[in-house]
């Protein structure tokens, strides 16, 4: 590519990561990419934050919201919205909706395919570093222990006990 970046070997990526994102399962790359005329980075059809941190603004996530409901990240109460919640606290909201250092989807999710059914990446990209996420799915929730915070767990009913010295994640008020 003119900017020096290489295009990913999608055949290998998809072969090694059996849980494919919806458009990949439908063999519809054009749901997200316009290979002939997009002015956006990575030939995307709509906006998607290119960095790890970004202030939350729904306009920055137009690509995601063409398929996913915006409440996935904008609703503080996660019941009926997401399985990624601690009791009723929507943990997508906690991570993404921060006014200055919201984590973008890429902080935890692999956009094309992953080994995890929830498209959880194995590593968190942070600058030139990659940290293991150490995600563990559990019957009523899950746990992770990336370098960005202490080990934490969550439960969809009730609340998970504090899993690290920093305590459970809380949204910025």
Residue ranges and their predicted role:
Residues 1-173:
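Flexible linker/context regions in extracytoplasmic redox proteins
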């Amino acid at each position: 590519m003119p900017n020096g970046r290489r295009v990913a070997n999608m055949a290998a990526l998809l072969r090694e990561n059996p849980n494919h994102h919806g458009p990949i399962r439908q063999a519809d790359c054009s749901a997200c990419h316009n290979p002939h005329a997009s002015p956006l980075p990575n030939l995307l059809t709509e906006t998607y934050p290119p960095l790890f941190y970004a202030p939350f603004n729904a306009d920055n996530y137009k690509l995601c919201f063409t398929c996913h409901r915006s409440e996935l990240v904008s609703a503080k109460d996660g019941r009926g919205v997401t399985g990624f919640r601690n009791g009723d606290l929507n943990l997508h909201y906690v991570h993404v909706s921060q006014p200055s250092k919201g984590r973008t989807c890429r902080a935890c999710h692999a956009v094309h395919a992953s080994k995890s059914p929830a498209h959880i990446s194995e590593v968190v990209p942070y600058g030139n570093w990659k940290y293991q996420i150490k995600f563990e799915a559990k019957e009523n929730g899950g746990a992770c222990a990336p370098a960005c915070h202490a080990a934490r767990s969550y439960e969809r009913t009730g609340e998970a006990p504090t899993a690290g010295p920093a305590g459970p994640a809380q949204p910025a008020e």
